[in-house]
Structure formats: C-alpha cells, structure tokens
Amino acid sequence: MKFKQDFFTQLPEFYSQVYPQGISNPHWLAWSDDAAALIGLHQPTDELLQGLSGNAAVEGASYYAQVYSGHQFGGYTPRLGDGRSIILGEAIGPNGAWDVALKGGGPTPYSRHGDGRAVMRSAVREFLVSEALHHLGVPTTRALAVIGSDMPVWRESQETAAITVRLARSHIRFGHFEFFSHSERGQADKLTQLLNFTLKQHYPHLSCDPAGYKAWFLQVVQDSAKMIAHWQAIGFAHGVMNTDNMSILGDSFDFGPFAFLDTFQEDFICNHSDPDGRYAFGQQPGIGLWNLQRLAQALTPVIASDDLIAALNQYQHALVQHYLALMRAKLGLVQQADSSAEQDQQDLELIGRFTVLMEKNQLDYSHTWRRFGQLDPSSLHSSLRDDFIDLNEFDAWYQVYQARLGKVTDVEAWQQQCNRVNPKYILRNYLAQEAIIAVDEGNLAQLQRLHQVLRQPFTEQIEHEELAKRPPDWGQGLIMSCSS
C-alpha cells in the first residue's frame, strides 16, 4: 500500500497518535477482492497479515485515532472519538484514496475504559454488511478483511478478538464538527479549518468561502437523504443512527446491531438497546433530518443560519425523490423525467398502500418484491395474489397498479428489469449468525460462501437457493445488542 497523510499532517488537533497493539495468532477469516482492488492490493499475504493485525509496522502508515463528539440516542456526549479504531492513513488506489482503519486494533485515548477490541462476531457482521450493501447499490464504507485471533476478550461471556480492516472515503463524521463547536472548544477557526480540509479533499469543485460552504452543506443534506432513501427501499435498519455514526459523505457507516427486514414491519427495532424505538426502521428518515439539524447547529459559527435552514428544507424533497425513483423501479414503473407533483403523490400512495398490505399480511419484504420478476403484469390474476389473506384489498390495489403501469409489450424484458433491482439474496441476521457459529467452530466455508453469494444479490444462483429462503422460526426478526 502507498499512503498519503493529509488528515494527519494538516489537522493535528483532530486526533491522537496511537499505535495498534497486536493480536495473538492472527489469521485471515475473510478477504474482499473487490475492496482490495480499491487500494491496489491483490491477494492477502503473510506480510500484510502481520501489518494489519498490529503485530508489525506498515510502511508509510501514521497510526492515529480521531476525536469527535456526538448525539447518542438524543443526548449530547461531549467527547467520544475512536475508542477502538486506529487509522493508518489514506491509501492511494487507482481511482482515489481510501482511509484504512483497524477496527479492534487496541485501546486509544478515547476508549473510555474499554479494551479497544472487537469480537469476532461483530467483525464478521461488519465485513458482511459493508460488502453486501455495496453490491446492493447502497452508498457505504467498505471492508477489506477480517483478521481473527486466539486472544480472549470479555463481553457477556468470553469471546475472541478480531479486527475488521475498514476502508472509507473519509472518516469525517457529523460529530467532528460538533466537537469543535460546543462547550469551551467552540472556536470558529477550528470549524473553518476542518471545513476547508473537507472541501479540498472531497469537494474540490467548491470554493472555501461562504458560497462554497453553503453549497457543501446542501450537498451533505442531499447525500444523507439519498443514503436513507436506499435504506428504506432495500429494507435496511441501521440500528444506531447517532450523529457520530453519520458520515459527512452520505456513506453507510459504523455498523452494529443492524438488520435487513424479514417480515415487513414499519416499527421494526433491530437494536436490543433501543426499547423505545428511536432508531426503528420507519423512524430513520426523520432521524436523518434530526441529525442534519444537529450538524447545522454546530456549523452556525461558520455558515449563515438562513443558508443552513434553506438546505435543511430541501431534505424531505430529496429523500422523497430518491425513494420514489428506487421504489418505482422495484414496481417496474416507468419514471417520466418530468413527473408532476400530483403523479409523485399518487405513486407514494400506491407504494404506501402496498407496504401496508405487506405488513397486514405479514409478508417477507424481499421475497415479495422479488416476486415481481415472475409477474405477468397484463394478467388480471396476479401471481402475487395467493400470498395475501385479504384478497379484496389486494385486488383493489392491483387494479390501481395495473392502471398506473400501463401496457407492457415485452413481459420478459420487464421481468428481467424487476429482477435487476429486487434482490434474491440479502444478509439476513440468521445467515450471519450461522456463519459466525461456523467460524467459531473453525469452519470458514460458510462465511466464504455467504460472502460470495452476496456479491451477486440480484442473480439467480441455483446452487445457493437455500440462502434465499425465509428465516427459520428462531431467526425471524432477530434483535442484536450493541455489545461488540
């Protein structure tokens, strides 16, 4: 790997230098060829294993943990920071630079009495979801590898330590701006310094002046709306949408107790530590705006309030337009470039009625959408109909849907188009759990197989048909904890 060290050299007050503490008996548990190509790597090597496990120095790496704050479950925490993630620097790839971070690399000044370690189960989950989301077309950070060990760590019980090697276009979070805005640290010069760095690194077309800042914040609003629209369309619940888990670039970030929907449930809670459902699936769009409002509040020393408010007022429109585009594609609808506000509202109602029907009939979210690839839209009797209990309600919906769809001249091409946007394979929690159990028993085959299948989520893979099945009773709607 070849590194540049722009964050390290230009923002010395935004991190602490800290070196990883190695893990015993490191070994590869997972590796992503796709992610490796982003930074010019090919095959995993012993030298790379020693470096990324913290047991040897990586040439050109600087090693640091970033400091930030954030709103966690609605309450402000003035000092957070990377408690178990150590960044090596920005690795230069063929199409840009990516931060390389060792998640679970050992304690840092921000560990808050924690051990700085990650356990194998959380490392495997983060690896799988990072790569799964990418191949589903969702903006996300990436995962290069998981490195296992025989080092014991204690959570609810004894587990083994592991490291996820994360790649990110940037690790700058909403919480970075909050840290230097609130309390005694509130200094406009630090905010301006961070903002200018962000623009030069990631928005070089924008100028470092009030006009550029205004345009930048609007872009953050739009990118965040796009990310959350993808989550809602694909049926993904993040679980911990704290402001310190929000990427400034609109990439899905910092995965913990996430879940993809099994049975559709608007108020589904995937996080055992969220009994009130603040971050429930259906709450994510509203929380996205709330988090952006907190970012705007932190930016008031450097961006005019009127400009911040004007950008925030664009959030709902951006979210709806991205969501409509994704859901129209799932329904096989043709989207006119100049669709009217009236048509948008009618389509939102059509989509909303269908998801309500799914919830009332307790249907599997991904399976139901995938069925559109088998549908003959010209038929008066939908093959979907048999999945529903309330047939009158479904028939009424289907009649409106057919009218909106219009005549389909090439049914096979239409079905193929539906299959290109409605995945056959998703990372259900029970599949991840089965892979984790197998890894714990020393068997990597199940993890490797699941990873490979999730690289082609829209493609029929007959030999892996069982990975597309609905979850067994024990795996339905699994709720995970934040323990990692």
Curated annotation (Swiss-Prot):
ATP binds at residues 81, 83-84, 103, 115-116, 166, 173, 254. Keywords: ATP-binding, Magnesium, Manganese, Metal-binding, Nucleotide-binding, Nucleotidyltransferase, Transferase. GO terms for molecular function: AMPylase activity; ATP binding; magnesium ion binding. Its EC number is 2.7.7.-, 2.7.7.108. It comes from the Bacteria. The keyword Nucleotide-binding applies. Mg(2+) binds at residues 245, 254. The keyword Transcription does not apply. InterPro entries: SelO. It catalyses: L-seryl-[protein] + ATP = 3-O-(5'-adenylyl)-L-seryl-[protein] + diphosphate; L-threonyl-[protein] + ATP = 3-O-(5'-adenylyl)-L-threonyl-[protein] + diphosphate; L-tyrosyl-[protein] + ATP = O-(5'-adenylyl)-L-tyrosyl-[protein] + diphosphate; L-histidyl-[protein] + UTP = N(tele)-(5'-uridylyl)-L-histidyl-[protein] + diphosphate. It is an enzyme of class 2 (transferase). Belongs to the SELO family. This is Protein nucleotidyltransferase YdiU. The gene is ydiU.
